[in-house]
Amino acid sequence: MAQWNQLQQLDTRYLEQLHQLYSDSFPMELRQFLAPWIESQDWAFAASKESHATLVFHNLLGEIDQQYSRFLQESNVLYQHNLRRIKQFLQSTYLEKPMEIARIVARCLWEEGRLLQTAVAAAQQGGPASHPNAAVITEKQQMLEQHLQDVRKKVQDLEQKMKVVENLQDDFDFNYKTLKSQSDLSELNGNNQSVTRQKMQQLEQMLTALDQLRRTIISDLASLLSAMEYVQKNLTDEELADWKRRQQIACIGGPPNICLDRLENWITSLAESQLQTRQQIRKLEELQQKVSYKGDPIVQHRPMLEERIVELFRNLMKSAFVVERQPCMPMHPDRPLVIKTGVQFTNKVRLLVKFPELNYQLKIKVCIDKDSGEGAALRGSRKFNILGTNTKVMNMEESNNGSLSAEFKHLTLREQRCGNGGRANCDASLIVTEELHLITFETEVYHQGLKIDLETHSLPVVVISNICQMPNAWASILWYNMLTNNPKNVNFFTKPPIGTWDQVAEVLSWQFSSTTKRGLSIEQLTTLAEKLLGPGVNYSGCQITWAKFCKENMAGKGFSFWVWLDNLIDLVKKYMLALWNEGYIIGFISKERERALLSPKPPGTFLLRFSESSKEGGITFTWVEKDISGKTQIQSVEPYTKQQLNSMSFAEIIMGYKIMDATNILVSPLVYLYPDIPKEEAFGKYCRPESQEHQEPTDPGTAPYLRTMFICVTPTTCTLDLPMSPGTFDSVMQFPGEGSESGNGNQFETLTFDVDLPSECAASPM
C-alpha cells in the first residue's frame, strides 16, 4: 500500500500532525493528486544535485498537466482551478530554484514515514503512551510554537511582496526603456515633448511606489530577523539548554530525559525559514542590479541584512549539533561518563536540523582533550589516544525516527605512556578519578554556498585503568553534574564547590531509584545525613564538602561515606533487588530508631538493616524477644556480606535461620517482618522450591540417598548436648566472633549446618 494511503487510515491525532507538515510552499492537494508519482521520485538526491532537481521539477510540471487533463475530462471545475493555481505558484516560486522544492518534498516524505512508524509502534504497544509527542507541552512551549508559526507566516507574506515588487519593477523597467527609445526618436523627429513629460511623470510615480514597496520589504525583513532572533534565543538558550541540563540529571540517575524530536522539529522549521529568507535577501540583490536609483534602500540595508541572516543560520546550526547519548561502556549502562582504558564505549551525536540533502554528507571525527593541549600537561593529567572507528558519516537510516545522527559503537581509549607512567607531571594535584576529559566531535557543513564548522563535546568523562576505581570515578561524575551545568569545566576538582544536603539527598535517592523500583524515604535519608553530618534536627541547607562525601573516612571507620554507600548499592542490585523493591528492607536506620520500632512489637518481629561497620557492604536482621523474666531483648545477627550471599540467597537465609536454645533445640526467632508481615508471606516466594525428584542410586540394592539442606544457626549457650563433630564444637566455642558490630542488644554469630533429611520429609520446612 502506498505511504499516502496508509497515512489516511491513521487516528485523528496523527492526521492533525500530518496537516501541520504542509503549507503553501508544498500544498497538500498536490500531494494528494500525485501521491504515487511523488513517492516514486528520489527527492533527497534531487535536493543535493541541481541538474537532477531541474529534471524532476519539469517532470512534476508535466505530471500536473496530465492530472489537469483528467480533471478536464471529468468536468471537475474546482480541481481544475486548484491545480492551475498550484502550477502557477510552483513556476513563479521554484523555477529558478528547483532544489528548494526538492528539499521541501523530501522533508515532508521523511516526516510522513516517521509519523507512520510512530503510529504503528503505538498500536503494537497498546496505546498512545509510546508516542514521542506524548510529553506535555508547557504554556511556554505553546507560545514558542506560536512564534514559530508567526515567523513562517511572515516569510510567506514576504514571498508574496517580493513577487509584487518584482512585477512592479519589471513594469517600470519596460516602461522606462520604452520611453527612452521613444524620447530618442522624438528628438530626431522634433516631435512635441509634452507626451514624453507626461510619461516621465508616470514613471516617477511608479518609481515612488517601487521605492515605498522596497522600503516596506526592508522593514519587514528587519522585523522578521528580529523575530527569528527571539525564537532562536528561546530555542538555544532555554529549550536546548534545559534539555542538556536534563541530560546531565539523567546521566546521574535522575528522571529520564525527554525525546529530542519536538525540539528537532522546531529547529528544523526555523532553519528552513532562515534559508528561505536568505534567498529573499539575495533576490533583492538581483532586483537592485536591474533597477537602482539614488537613495535605494536595498543598497543601504541589504548587506547588513544578509550578514545578519547568515550569522543567525550559522549559530543555529552550531547549536543544533549535540551529543544525544553520552559516552558509556555497554557493560555499565547505569554509570555513563566513566570509561576504562581498553574497554569499548559508545556515544551518539545528532544534528537537530533535519535536511534530507545532508544525508550521508557530514563526516564526523572524534578526538579527546582537543582543547586541553598544554594545559592538561601543566595540570599533570594523563593523555589518551582514541582507537577504533573514530570517523563516521551522519545518516538518517540508522535512527528509528529518521534523525540525522551518527553512533560510535567501537571506540576505546589508550593512555599515552610517559617516563613516569603516563602522568605528564609528577606534581599533579588531582588523583586520576578527579581528572576530567572531554570527547570532541567535529565536522564541516557545506550548504547553499555556506561552509560551517560544527563542533560539540561530551560531558566531562573520568578515565580509569582498573575497575576498582569505578566507585570514586562515579562519585566524581555525581558531584560534577550535581553542582554545575558548565559542560566543559575540566578544572572542576582543582577547587570543588560545596554541595548542600538537599542536593546530595536527591542524588543519593536517584542511585537507588535508577537501578531499582524504589528510592530512599525521608527517614532513610535522615539516617544518611546523620552519618555524614552528625546528629541534628534539621539538615536542610547543611553544607557538605567533596572531601567529606568521598575522600575522608567516617568517624570511627576506616572508609569514606561514599565507599560504604556504593558497596551497599551494589549489594542491593546483585543480591536482594526483589526484597528492596518490595520495601522489605528498611536498610538505613539508627540503633535508637531500631529499638523504638521493635520494642513494642510481639516477640519474633524483625527488621532488615544495613551494616554500618562493613566496608564491603553487609546486611543484618534484628529481632525482638523476651527473656525468662519477661524483659524485652533486642538481638542482631552478625551481618551477611557478599561472600555469604554468593552461596545462599538472603530470603533463604531468613527462612531457614535458627537459634539453638539452652536445651539444644533449634528454634526460629524470626516470625513477623516489621511491622506485622508473616515471614513466609514475605520471603517464601523468593526461596527456591524443593525439587520433588531426587537422584536415586543406580544399584537397586543400595539404600536411597539422604537429602540435605543448609540452615544458619546461632548458639545461645556453650553447654550444648547435641552430638557434634570436634570442628563444629570448636566453632561454637569461638562465639562471639571477632569484628562483630556492637550496639543494641547481643550480636550473634551464625553457624551453617549441613543437615541430613530423610527423603520422606525433605520438603518439609524446619
Curated annotation (Swiss-Prot):
The keyword DNA-binding applies. GO terms for cellular component: cytoplasm; nucleus; RNA polymerase II transcription regulator complex. It holds the Pfam family STAT_int. The keyword Nucleus applies. Keywords: Activator, Cytoplasm, Developmental protein, DNA-binding, Nucleus, Phosphoprotein, SH2 domain, Transcription, Transcription regulation. GO terms for molecular function: DNA-binding transcription factor activity; DNA-binding transcription factor activity, RNA polymerase II-specific; protein homodimerization activity; protein kinase binding; RNA polymerase II cis-regulatory region sequence-specific DNA binding; sequence-specific DNA binding. Phosphorylation of both tyrosine and serine residues, together with dimerization, is required for mesoderm induction. It is found in: Cytoplasm; Nucleus. InterPro entries: p53-like_TF_DNA-bd_sf, SH2, SH2_dom_sf, STAT, STAT3_SH2, STAT_linker, STAT_N_sf, STAT_TF_alpha. A motif (Essential for nuclear import) lies at residues 150-162. Residues 580-670 form the SH2 domain. Its main location: cytoplasm. One of its GO terms (biological process) is defense response. The modification Phosphoserine is found at S725. PROSITE patterns: SH2 (PS50001). Forms a homodimer or a heterodimer with a related family member. Interacts with nlk.2. Belongs to the transcription factor STAT family. PANTHER family: SIGNAL TRANSDUCER AND ACTIVATOR OF TRANSCRIPTION. Involved in the gp130-mediated signaling pathway. Transcription factor that binds to target promoter sequences and activates transcription upon il6st/gp130 stimulation. Mediates ventralization of embryos, at least in part via inhibition of smad2 signaling. Required for hairy2 to induce dll1/delta1 and promote neural crest cell proliferation and differentiation. Involved in TGFbeta-mediated mesoderm induction in early embryos, acting downstream of map3k7/tak1 and nlk.2. This is Signal transducer and activator of transcription 3.2. It comes from Xenopus laevis.
